[in-house]
Each structure stands twice: as C-alpha cells, then as structure tokens.
Amino acid sequence: MSKSALDPVEFLKGALEIPSPSGKERLVAEYLAEGMQKLGLKGFVDEADNARGQVGEGPVQVVLLGHIDTVPGQIPVRLEGGRLFGRGAVDAKGPFVAMIFAAAGLSEEARKRLTVHLVGATEEEAPSSKGARFVAPRLKPHYAVIGEPSGWEGITLGYKGRLLVKARREKDHFHSAHHEPNAAEELISYFVAIKAWAEAMNVGQRPFDQVQYTLRDFRVHPAQLRQVAEMFFDL
C-alpha cells in the first residue's frame, strides 16, 4: 500500500493517544505494527513488545531505532498552531513515526540495495532497556540511526552515558536528641559531596563534557530498631 494510505499527523496523533509508560507498551506497539502493515511494510510485535518493521531485500542492513515508551504522566493530545502536543510527541514516538514514513517512502532501487529494520523499542525510559537488549544480539546492521530528540537542524553523533545510583544508609536507631548524625543526614552529606565533586570536575568544561547530577528520589523509612534512608540519583 502506498505511503498516502495513512496521514502522518493523524497516525502519530493516534499513537500519542495510547498511554505507554515503560512496561506497558503492548497496545501502542500493536497500533504501530498495524500502521506499518498498511504502509506496505512487514509490521509485527516481537517477544519484547517492540514495534518492529522491515522493508527491502538488499545486502546493506540498516536499523532505524526509536522507542515507544514514555515517562509517566499524560499531556492532553492536541494539534495547536501547526504543532502536535502529547506525551511522546518529541521523546520519542514522533521520531519513530517519522522513521516509519521514511522507510515506507523508499524507492524500488533503494529497496533492492537495503534491508531496513525499524525498531520501536520498549523500556528505554527505564533502567532495564528491555527492547534494545532484545534486538541487540539479533540485528547486525551496517548502519544504525537513533530517533531521539536532539534538534531538527543537525545530526547528533553521540550521546553521553548515564549512571543510575541507588544509595542506602542503615544504622542503629537512637534518640533524636543524640549528637550523632542520623542515617538521613549522612546520606544527604554523601550527595552534597557528590555535587561538590561534579562541580569541581565541570570547571571550564563545555556542557557535553560536564558531569551532570540529578537527585531523583529520597526516602526515610520509619525507624524501629534500625534507621534506614535511601536515595536515587543519576550522573
């Protein structure tokens, strides 16, 4: 079926209207796979709930990789002033839908030279990276293009790595009037030290080369015999 069988904006709008937080991508994967089939691609959902597509039969293997999960929280889907708003419009259902239509528009000559694999990966926004880990040993492309928001006016050649840290401090419980710092205070001091280290490393560095830190969660569990404090941060 020709590329005109689906309207790109309406197709993306439909994908945005299907909630797909990490771990719950099956419905949107099925929607995207069905759309790929309508566009004449081989569309399917794999064992990791990735939305998959394939076109061409050439020797040069190309992977167009995006992700279809989102962070939690809904943004009302709306088309306003020529812009489409919704959770995942930019990160990253929008880029993946653009890749789908690009693949569907390949010429017959290109299809003879290339085999293009589309992967709308699951759990990219989660530490598990389930979808990418599933396809990594199964696809060996000559070229890979990643669909992530990075500005439309250029091509991003690399991304920084990310370290997720869960820190936990546990110690014997004592009265609040005691002079010794409690578990929560010690954990706060630890994060303050991390900040100081990062800021010292960042002096004179361009943004890409800086160590960026974010405190994502901090919890103090009710004290009984032991004090327990936990925090999650990333670098």
Regions found by a protein language model. Name each.
Residues 97-164:
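Acidic/histidine-rich catalytic neighborhood of metal-dependent amide-processing enzymes
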Residues 74-75, 153-157, 219-225:
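Short beta-strand/turn micro-motifs at beta-sheet edges
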Residues 85-97, 181-184:
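Short, conserved micro-motifs enriched in small and acidic residues
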Residues 19, 36, 53, 64-67, ...:
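Buried hydrophobic positions in well-ordered alpha/beta secondary-structure cores of metabolic enzymes
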Residues 13, 33, 97-104, 133-136, ...:
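Predominant activation on well-ordered alpha-helical scaffold segments within soluble catalytic domains
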Residues 1-89, 111, 169:
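Acidic/His- and Gly-rich active-site-bordering loop/insert found
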Residues 176-232:
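Acidic-enriched catalytic cores of C-N bond-cleaving enzymes acting on peptides and small amides
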Residues 162-175:
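Hydrophobic/proline-rich hinge and linker segments of small-molecule sensing/allosteric domains
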